[in-house]
Swiss-Prot record:
Subcellular location: Cytoplasm
Coiled coil: none
Listed name of the protein: Eukaryotic translation initiation factor 3 subunit H
Organism: Salmo salar
Ranges for region Disordered: 1-24, 256-305
A Gene Ontology biological process term: formation of cytoplasmic translation initiation complex
Compositionally biased spans, kind Low complexity: 8-23, 261-272
Keyword entries, A-Z: Cytoplasm, Initiation factor, Protein biosynthesis
Length: 344
């Protein structure tokens, strides 16, 4: 029986290509996305997303000066473990070829991914986005949160890797010394790019007419508090990540103790060796042959620190989600209290 794969794979980065008007030396300062693309991403999750399962797809468009225009997208199909012959690169090329035949923008400009309660900061996302930005400098990743969107407000954010993190990933130096030298922390890993949703004039007129026809039965319903399930789940995920961080700290502390202990043993061995050679010299004996101390005392392998940074970044996301949720509810409570006092 076929079983679904876990959502750990990420879209494969395309070969480098640029569009007319692209300026590789200037960063992307704004993203303009068509409303149709947003609807396609939402539809993709509603059709194939199940709970915490992640859906992914490719973004197409072009670059105009410092603005990235996303005009179309297509999803990656959910394949099972039995689909060993599925080739993601071949699938992307066939889709782009089909879009080119119907005169639709077919240049890669990034990829999108859904998230479960803001859980998107991971090594898989980092590696995939690095591949995209390394091939096409203007590439972005769009993160769509269906949980927040279902509560009444569209949650769609665009991220890019910072130049510091790009250099670290190129050098592949994820040690504590390398990260310290680059002066990079979890707050300097991703940079958010502002998004502007663009619709045609006819769609704007239609939305204006629909807004005029829509009536709110009870305006006080807007003051209803959000469900506590969202807060409970966010706190649970936050505690899980704090536990992961605690385990990483224990591993690094163990490595530091072992390294210090080995350095002490190495120093003691060197001193004993020098004393013994001094005694042999006073007795007129030949000194002991020199030995490679570094081979005798091999330093322990340092644990990579990039995973710790990713965990810290995810903890920060959960904290921001909790802060946003509680601030909205507190605002509603104060507004309800003011209205109640005014009516009484």
């Amino acid at each position: 029986m076929a079983t679904r794969k876990e959502s750990t794979s990420t879209p494969t980065a395309p070969m480098a290509s640029t569009s007319p008007g692209a300026t590789l030396d200037s960063p992307v300062k704004q993203i303009q996305i068509e409303g149709l693309v947003v609807l396609k991403m939402i539809k993709h999750y509603q059709e194939e997303g199940q709970g915490s399962e992640v859906v992914q797809g490719v973004l197409l468009g072009l670059v105009v000066e410092d603005r990235l225009e996303i005009t179309n997208c297509f999803p990656f199909p959910q394949h099972t473990e039995d689909d060993a012959d599925f080739d993601e690169v071949q699938y992307q090329m066939e889709m782009m070829r089909s879009l080119r035949h119907v005169n639709i923008d077919h240049l890669h400009v990034g990829w999108y991914q859904s998230t479960y309660y803001g859980s998107f900061v991971s090594r898989a996302l980092l590696d995939s986005q690095f591949s995209y930005q390394h091939a096409i400098e203007e590439s972005v990743v769009l993160i769509y949160d269906p949980i927040k969107t279902a509560q009444g407000s569209l949650s769609l954010k665009a991220y890019r890797l910072t130049p510091k993190l790009m250099e670290i990933c190129k050098e592949k130096d994820f040690s504590a010394e390398g990260l310290k030298k680059a002066m990079i922390g979890f707050e300097h890993m991703f940079e958010e790019v502002p998004i502007v949703i663009k619709n045609s004039h006819l769609i704007n007129v239609l939305m204006w007419e629909l807004e005029e026809k829509c009536t709110v039965a009870d305006k006080h319903e807007l003051l209803n508090l959000s469900s506590s399930n969202h807060l409970e789940k966010s706190l649970q995920l936050l505690m899980d990540r704090v536990d992961d961080m605690s385990q990483d700290i224990v591993k690094y502390n163990t490595y530091s103790r072992n390294l210090s202990k080995q350095q002490q043993q190495k120093h003691q061995y060197t001193q004993r060796r020098q004393q013994e050679n001094a005694q042999r010299q006073t007795r007129g004996e030949t000194p002991l042959p020199e030995e490679d101390v570094s081979k005798m005392f091999k330093p322990p392998q340092p644990p990579p620190r990039m995973d710790t940074l990713l965990i810290a970044g995810q903890i920060n996301n959960y904290c921001q989600n909790v802060k946003e949720f509680t601030s909205q509810n507190l605002g509603k409570l104060f507004m309800a209290e003011a209205l109640q006092g005014h009516n009484s």
